């Protein structure tokens, strides 16, 4: 018997999963109906009521991951804390604020024979999300997709199976409380790869795929499906420190871009430091290291520079020689590479060769250097004199976010609720024809 809140087991045909989702869409209220607001509230309240169960299941997932030898940063991605419950409440409130604008029709345009046309928002349909670790995505994916009128199929990784089982029940209860069709959210209870692959082939029933995870997961989804994909891409991100920058500011931004969430998609992987800024930069970095501010951060620096680094830095932090394979690498760990470059052009050329097009940054006191960098760097976001972690939907004031897309079509940057809505043109013809008259 299938556990409450979980989708059918893998031996059940994928037809049942997609059929349930399509049927739910047919029975769902129109976009903007009050049931969607009630669902957002019910998810937040339900998570609060059952937080002890969620926390217990999550602790089991973390312990299982530790026993399997998962890294500390990866375990941090699995771990839920009280702040995440607060996040769910904030997400629900944010969606409530965004829905009126989301459902507002576009302006009326007048055409041939006095016809009147306007764009009317419509849900995309069935959204299939695949993600690794991060059980917060289970709640975020359900809230953003359902409140924009879509049915969603959620497939988390094995590492969060226990947490997802409880969250699936929370979501199922919220659908009942809000009187939405039960099939609007399906949390797959088994991470069977055959089921996953078959769902990617169902372009007749699934309208959008959103993968969040490793580059290999994202690349597989792109190559294995004919369904449109919003890519939550990997973050091989750089921070360029121009010679005109304040070294104190540069180091502060570097640390905030790396330490709080080293496995996050906006985490800094390599600092590109101007030759003219290197001495002051490393001196400040050494001061912060001596004060314990770098935590367990491991540095990778060109071998020829290691001997010239401040003694305090080498004494406080592990420093390893930088290798060619470190270029373009997403560490997903407390590892930071540093390269010294000869000006803006060399920094930009390095980013063009090795960046992933996610988030790039510059620390600079020169308007000319900043403008040159921003014009030449092609990424979903370019941050000027700020932490790379500012590239975040809620932080930017854009509202709830599902992922950060590195694609070029439909959406680039934060994937907010409006990215899950398409439009229908409503044309009032008033009897107009094109040719017969």
Feature annotation, model-predicted:
Residues 1-117, 144:
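N-terminal Rossmann-like NAD(P)+-binding subdomain of aldehyde/semialdehyde dehydrogenases
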